[in-house]
Amino acid sequence: MRKRAAVLVLSLLILCVAPMQAFALGTNQVTNLEIGPLWVSITEFTNSFEISGSGLAQFDTSLYARSNINKVVINASIQQYINGSWQAVNSWTSTTYSNSGYLNQKWYVMSGYYYRLVSTGAVYQDDVLVEQTSYTGSSYWY
């Protein structure tokens, strides 16, 4: 029995002292993963917004979808932060009967407020809604 106990203690000691190997994923395996929207029919939805020194706010919104889509609707609004909440200053809609759409507008804004762009894009196949997405941009002081 003493012999078994000695063998057991010796085995445990070897396990504790022996170096263990651990492997991690290489950095290139981790960085290859991209975080992005999980769209099925929409392939690209881009938005840009800027305010010039004279107060001219301008935005561009575009949406591209797969070839089975035959209607694209884009809604966009310039919002102003006033009295603790965001309020639409003006809104626009673009409807195209193809698999891509584009909307750009200009609008003069009043100084002394924050402004941002909020937009939505929806794609249809034979007038049946297939997918939609939305965007809320960063706020800009003017």
List where the protein language model places each region.
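Sec-dependent N-terminal signal peptides of Gram-positive bacterial secreted proteins and lipoproteins
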Residues: 2-24
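Intrinsically disordered, low-complexity sequence elements enriched in Ser/Thr/Gly/Pro
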Residues: 1-2, 114
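Mature extracytoplasmic or otherwise solvent-exposed domains
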Residues: 23-142
